[in-house]
Amino acid sequence: MELIAVFDFDGTLIKKDSMILFFLRYFDLSIKNLPNFCRLILETLKYFLKIYSQKQFKEKYINLIIASSRLKDREALFKDFSKYLLEMVFKTAKKKIIEFKKNGYKTILLSASPDLYLEKISKGLGFSELICTRTAYIDNRTVISSLNCYGNNKIKMLLNKYKEDRVDWEGSYCYTDSQSDRGLLNLFGNPHIVNNIRFGKKNPDFKSVIWK
């Protein structure tokens, strides 16, 4: 049976949310781009009013930022963003990934964030596999081509690749900061909450760790 070590990305391997960082780094806040900014506010309101699903909003959000960016080469944009995020990864996390690989674990990056930048990050950190929200480029726009890898979908997508009878769950590890991953943590014999003291206090059965 396989031993696996699963890592979330946003808030776990890096301190902040990568989708917010994507906006801050690439959205052009000039007067010329005001129509796109207004549209982004409108799309965000529709999401919070539950007119859009998280998957629909994510797709619109990504496309609006790409359209407004001063960096017009799509491939160059995501290459730059991957490099930027890699520099933010906690040193503790990097050591853990290396340690698990040395001990024969299959290391998995499991995230709701898109493959647009996670592919390069996953390779850069030496992960065995990436399971995330998948995208395709169709008619000059990015579309989400898989399930949104969030909440219960994370569990579904993980178990799709790693059948329950194939994995030594009791000996395997999971690291996340997100309360939406509570069900995911319950699969593992070694569940860890990263850098979220409040979540840890509510769930004393999970081990809390601080990564820097």
Q: Where is each model-derived feature located?
A:
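Active-site neighborhood of HAD-like aspartate-dependent phosphohydrolases
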Residues: 1-50
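C-terminal cap/substrate-recognition subdomain and adjoining C-terminal extension
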Residues: 2, 83-212
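Glycine-rich adenosine-cofactor-binding loop
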Residues: 53
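Metal-dependent phosphoesterase signature
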Residues: 56-92
